[in-house]
């Protein structure tokens, strides 16, 4: 699904909030719960949650996503430190703008709001990126595969931005 819909928080009802938290926080936690003991027993495991760059720099129209994903990030920060001594790592990937259906839908909505054609909205969004382009799913997949490898046993509890340098902070 890619995440909850963008919008104004005043338009979301309680069910929208519960759905966002269920799909973007609780579901991840339940999956972790289902596999963590086996990983601990084997003394090896890699868990990578795909959240959002909005965890570091929330997007104004993505309040449902911002809140739910920040909750998951907080939970993982503590759990990763509990299981690290068992050879299990848990990290979060925080994607920025990658060429996905979700990004295209968000840009289409922005274009409609601004009264500009979709192609112009895409060009405007790419121009706002540091690299002048969006990330590819192949690039993102390679980073995820690396975090799942045996080479990353000393990386845990981290939030890795994969945003092409869009986030300007240093911490």
What is the role of each PLM region?
Residues 57, 145, 156-171:
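Short C-terminal tail/terminal secondary-structure segment
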Residues 37, 81-82, 153:
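Alpha-helical segment proximal to the catalytic Tyr-Lys
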Residues 32-33, 77:
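A short, exposed helix-loop element centered on a Lys and neighboring polar residues
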Residues 84, 89, 155-157:
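Short, small/polar-rich loop/turn modules that mediate ligand/substrate recognition or access, typified
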Residues 8-10, 16-21, 47, 125:
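Substrate-binding pocket helix/loop in short-chain dehydrogenase/reductase
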Residues 48-71, 76-85, 97-98:
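Catalytic loop of short-chain dehydrogenase/reductase
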Residues 117-118, 129-140, 151:
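A conserved structural motif in NAD(P)-dependent oxidoreductases
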